[in-house]
Each structure stands twice: as C-alpha cells, then as structure tokens.
Amino acid sequence: MKNTTEEKREAIPNSVSRMLLAGIGVLLQVLWIFWLALKLNDYSTAIQVCTSVLTFLITLRIYGLHINSAYKISWIILILLFPIFGLTIYLLFGRSGAVSVMRRRFGRNMTMLRQYHVPILQQRRALPYPDRITRNHARYLQDRAGYPAYDNTDVTFYGDTCEALEAQKTALRSAEKFIFMEYHAIEDASAWQELEDILAERAAHGVEVRVFYDDVGSIGFINSKFVKKLAGRGIQCRRFNPVIPILNVFMNNRDHRKITVVDGRVGFTGGYNLAEEYFNRTHPYGQWKDSGIRLEGDAVRGLTLIFLELWGATQKAAPEVERYLPDVPYTAQENAVVLPYADNPLDDEATGENVYLNMIRSAKDYVYITTPYLILSDEMQRTLRLAASSGVDVRIITPGIPDKKLIFSVTRSYYASLAKSGVRIYEYAPGFIHAKQCVADGTEAVVGTINFDFRSLYLHFENACWFCGCSAVADVRRDFDALFPVCREVTQEYADTRSLAVRGWDCVLRLFSPLM
C-alpha cells in the first residue's frame, strides 16, 4: 500500500455557483416560511392552536408510517422540541417520495419492466444454489422485490478500481449496439475523458450511447455545459433530479446507482463513481479504497432493466425495452447464481437493508462488511450484536480518514454497543474506504452501492448484485483478508467504558443520526 497524503479537491467554478445559487435560494425560502410562521404564531391564538393541532397530527402520521422506528423517533422529537422549525423541515425534506409526475412515471416504468422479469422468474426456480440458505435469500429478492436470479453468468471481482476501469474501457471499445452508463458522480477530468473518448468513437460508429448522472452527486465535478458537450459528440446525456433554487421534496432522493451495460452482454457495478479520487489520481482523503464487479452472461439483462427504471422515468413516453434485451449466446465457466437488484424510496420495501439482514442472520461462521458510513437502525444493531454474541465472527471496516467529519463522528458513536457484543471494528488506516461489500461463510457475497446508513437504505435509488457459487465470492473474502492488516482495530478501545461526556455526546449524535 503506497503512502499518500490528503489533497484539497478543486471544484468546477460553474458548479460551485450553481450549488451556491440553489443553496441560497432554498435557504431563503426556508427562512421566509419560518419567519412567516413565527409572525402568524405571535399574531393569533388561533394560529397557535392550529400549529399545535398540526404538530399533533403530523406526529401521529409519522408514528403510523411503515418506516424504521429510529427514523420516526428522530423526526417526532425534532417536531415536538421545535414545532415550527421541525414541521417546516419535515414537510420539505422528511418524506421519502417524489413529485406526482416522477412518481407516476417511475410507477409506470416499474409496472412495464416487471413484465420482462416475469418469464425469468418463472424459468429459474431450479438454479444451482450451494445450500438452502442461499436459495432462501434469492427467493426473498425474487418474490418480494421482483428481481430474478440468473445462471450462465461469470462474475469478476475487482478490489482495485484501476483494474475495474481498464476492464470497463476494454468492454466499451467492443460495443456494437448500445452502451448504458448510470452514475451518482461523474467528474469531467482525466479518467472520465478516457471513457468519453471511447464513447464518442463508438457513437461515431453507430453505437447508441446513453449517460445518466445524478445532479447533486456531480455538481462539484462538472459544469452546466456537460450535457451539451456530450450531445455534440453523439452521446445522449441526462441529469437525474436537477438542482434548482426552489424547495422540492424530491431533492432529498438521489440516484446513487452505478451501472455500465455494453450490448446487453457485459455489465459493471460496484461502489466507485467516475471521478479522479476513486482511481487514486487525486487523494483528498488519503488512499481511496473501492471495489466493483464485472458480469458477463445472462445476468446482464437484470442490470439493463435496472438502468431503464430511472432513465425511462425522466421522459414522458414509455421507454423502448425489447431491443435492449438481446439473446446473446454465452457459456459461463462457473455455475454461479447471480442476482442484480435495486432499491428505491418510493415503496415500503427496504430491499437493500433486508438483503444485509438476511446474510447476517443466517451466517454460521463469519460475515465481513465494508461501509463508508455506519448509521444503523435498531434492527440492524440487534442483528449484528446477536450474530456476534452467538459466535459468528462479525467484522466491519469503516474509513480511517473521513470525507465528512460529522458523519464520521456519528459512525463512531455506534462502535461501543457493537464492540461490547463482540463485533470487531476496524478503521482503514491509509485513508477512505468507500467500498460497499459483504461476504458471509464463503458461500455468498454482495457488491454494490448500498451503504449501511439511512440515506442509502431508505432515501436513495440504489443497486447491488448478490451472487453465490462462484470464485468471485472467495475473491471478495481475499480482499477482506488483505484489508485487515492495513486497518487499525478499535474494538477494545470502544468496548471499554468511556467517560460520561463522551457517552452523552454519542447519544445525541445517534438520536438525530437518521436525519443525516
């Protein structure tokens, strides 16, 4: 592991101005609403009564929602302590969902795309699962989330994102029909430029190229002319949920997915975005650690359909689907079962969290986890503690150098209760670990975009891939084995009794952590 130093990242000036304009616009509107509510509250007893009634009704509504209890409690306490401020913030940012147009389009897309999952769901009941446990885990994703499992697929794991990037470039150069790319963050710098040049060359040869990025995730990396620049090179490009200086409930729900699909035969996903730091070309937080996977074979169909979920939701007409689901002849080298899946904030199914919970609950020997942020629900905490208390080797790796110091403090506030139950906590000493991966008992693994925090599990559009019965599972385990020696284990430090002040501060952080 080479030594690196922290470097400041320079933001794109145009992006900074957009971010400031949007932030100032939203802040002014929030302050105006807050000021108006205070004035009205002082002006009339009737207004005070209405505020109290509204506070009571909203509190009841939150309590009755089918969402995580910690999330509900945090909002209820905020509203009861600061009624006007709490109500304003909750009505603006506290509800998972979308404006009616986006919700309608997304629902239309999901209904239509499910039709393409159904034949696979019906055909793939007798796949070569290693055991009953993995079969049941796949069954959950198929029966509840609606995403089918596939065989005839080879999985390649990359613990080094530079290797993943090179494999991605090789696949892109071979494209003959279409390329789909969806990422939370794209930085218009050297790594992206290498990809863009390949995309433009393929587009010039008649390949349909689509690029889709989240506007908030990319706002510090690219300027407002990025979409036009790509269009000038023959590349279709769209922004998800553009930043505007107007209050919008849906602004809280971001596209955190990372997907590349080439001709429906090769696909990539994982934790890394297409920005310099993800490939250690810059070092804003020391050495960057991330991971990803390459799929080749039938399961790429699943990634294609996941891409079309949000791409189609940004247009009025229903997206064309069948032409992007070619029957590609392929014979896999291993008997893997591969299941690409996604999660979204517009339903009541916490798919991403439930996959993790299933793996932890059924682990017999070990379960290893990496996550950049550790903000856990009560259920997740109990599950991790119970597994460790039952003799399972539970280990979690978090960053050694944080990208967000407040969130890092929140992450550390969860260490003590976990460590006292036997969960082993490690911090990645060389820098920032951004990988989102989990492996259990050497039989199954997940690699994707889903962090162990509330935003990933409840508010964002996410995707991941669960797989078993292939050498990639062992490769994920080997990646963990290489990580532990360069990490600093802090288990005992947090298992020991700490001062009352520290414990009190941790309680405050955890109380409002679901809102971060």
PLM segments and residue spans:
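N-terminal localization/anchoring segments of enzymes in phospholipid and broader phosphate metabolism
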Residues: 1-354, 358, 362, 402, ...
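Short glycine/threonine-rich loop-to-helix capping motif typified by GTGT followed
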Residues: 382, 408-412
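Glycine- and other small-residue-rich loops at beta-strand/loop junctions that grip anionic moieties
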Residues: 184, 372-373, 407
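Active-site donor-binding acidic/aromatic loop of nucleotide-activated sugar
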Residues: 425-429
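A short, conserved beta-strand element enriched in hydrophobic/aromatic residues
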Residues: 290, 370-371
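Catalytic-core elements of nucleic-acid end-processing and repair enzymes
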Residues: 436
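Helical hairpin unit composed of two closely spaced alpha helices linked by a short loop
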Residues: 363, 373-395, 399, 404
